[in-house]
From Swiss-Prot:
The modification Leucine amide is found at residue 15. This is Caeridin-5. Keywords: Amidation, Amphibian defense peptide, Secreted. Coiled coil: none annotated. The keyword Secreted applies. GO terms for cellular component: extracellular region. Expressed by the skin parotoid and/or rostral glands.
Length: 15
């Protein structure tokens, strides 16, 4: 994601 730490895989915010 944009600020993704984990959700980057889903292209989310990674919260």
């Amino acid at each position: 994601g944009l600020l993704g730490m984990v959700g980057s895989l889903l292209g989310g915010l990674g919260l």
